[in-house]
Amino acid sequence: MHKTVLLQEAIEGLNLKEGSWVVDATFGGGGHSLEICRKYKNVKIIALDQDKNALEKAESKFKDCQISFHHTNFRDLDKVLEKEGVKEVDGIIFD
């Protein structure tokens, strides 16, 4: 099991504001995204992971968050952003 490291430092380093768009390009267990959801109620997260099982497990933990899950590799980020109608993001997490 992957343990999220430098969690607070990573979140603070993003310098997010309410209404920001964030990509979690290697979602996994969703540690960073969950902390973002707790800290910012109006931040939108786009979560990518190749492990469909990880995404399915996470859905119940994130029901109160503004998050969209995508079963894909981060190399397809441009396609995901186009599908979401997002032209730019305010932060990207790779962990």
What do the predicted segments below correspond to?
Residues 18-28, 46:
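Conserved class I S-adenosyl-L-methionine
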Residues 15-21, 87-88:
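Short helix-loop-beta connector
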Residues 51:
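Conserved SAM/SAH-binding beta-strand->alpha-helix loop
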Residues 58-59:
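Conserved SAM-binding loop
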Residues 29-42:
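Conserved SAM-binding loop of SAM-dependent methyltransferases across substrates and taxa
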Residues 79-94:
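A short acidic, Gly/Pro-enriched loop at the edge of an enzyme's catalytic core
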Residues 3-18, 35:
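Conserved alpha-helix/loop element of class I SAM-dependent methyltransferases that forms part
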